[in-house]
Amino acid sequence: MTNTKSNVTKKSLHPRNKHTGNYDFPALIKACAELKPFVETNQYGNESINFSDPQAVKALNKALLAHFYNVPFWDIPQGYLCPPIPGRADYIHNIADLLAITNEGTIPTGKKVKGLDVGVGANCVYLIIGNREYQWSFVGSDIDPQSIKMASFIANNNPSLKGIECRLQKNEENIFKGIIKPTEFFDFTMCNPPFHASEAEATAGTERKQKNLAANKAKKGHAFQEMQNAKALNFGGQKAELWCEGGELAFILKMAQQSREFSLQVQWFTTLISKKENVAELYKELEKIGVKTIKTIEMAQGQKISRFVAWTYQANVNL
């Protein structure tokens, strides 16, 4: 049994992340003119956008994906999760480092490397970044037909994206079964699990984020208009994206249990974990079912610390 936990508190994005430093708004506007109306000069004399405005955040995402990843077409339906691109890129780059561990220290690239994004959502962002940065092939799964439809539309309407397939999970109780085919092998799986245990909890979380953003902007002297729509895009999300019965812990424990059936078809299973206290619970479950190697990888974006846990049933992995 090999267990490792990162004890280093990081303060910056992954060194290969393209989104370090300030946004180059002239370049982003050149890539996506839709961003221009949302860019304004703040009290410090810097160009920025109002991050409390969901349309501004959506336009910024469009520009980032067009400029950095040559993905000119990107959109999401109203009310679906609009993820921050830099943090999503960090997960991908850290997975690349993880794959190097079982590839003689070299990051594997190309279409033969295959990943599964559990809960791809309508935004398709992980698949876009992994495909464009490392040319990996991807399968994205989701229980929401609209998410699959939109993610597939994005993948099929950007010529730069190759080897991306989206599959509908027809049974909400299954995570891998019904998605991973009998003869398929995946180098890794990834997941941003539902955080909340109920819709009421998810709504309360959205409102709390909005209040915190308002307070932070007030401290900095920015004018702030309270968002009336509790499902603002940058804090939005459908049921499958935000909550499930039992919340994050129940979901990741189910993932651990169901991973056993696919131990020979997946090199590395991984999942983000928002609540730090859930890491120990996942470790206990993985050890109980006989996982050989478990690793926790910390990531950071400014003051925000996030993490994902990775595990493999392969023995003798030298971490």
Curated annotation (Swiss-Prot):
One of its GO terms (molecular function) is 23S rRNA (adenine(1618)-N(6))-methyltransferase activity. It catalyses: adenosine(1618) in 23S rRNA + S-adenosyl-L-methionine = N(6)-methyladenosine(1618) in 23S rRNA + S-adenosyl-L-homocysteine + H(+). One of its GO terms (cellular component) is cytoplasm. Gene3D superfamilies: Vaccinia Virus protein VP39. It is found in: Cytoplasm. It comes from the Bacteria. Keywords: Cytoplasm, Methyltransferase, rRNA processing, S-adenosyl-L-methionine, Transferase. Its main location: cytoplasm. It is an enzyme of class 2 (transferase). One of its GO terms (biological process) is rRNA base methylation. Its EC number is 2.1.1.181. Pfam families: Methyltransf_10. InterPro entries: METTL16/RlmF (IPR010286), rRNA_lsu_MeTfrase_F (IPR016909), SAM-dependent_MTases_sf (IPR029063). HAMAP family: 23SrRNA_methyltr_F. Specifically methylates the adenine in position 1618 of 23S rRNA. Belongs to the methyltransferase superfamily. METTL16/RlmF family. This is Ribosomal RNA large subunit methyltransferase F. The lineage of its organism: Bacteria, Pseudomonadati, Pseudomonadota, Gammaproteobacteria, Vibrionales.
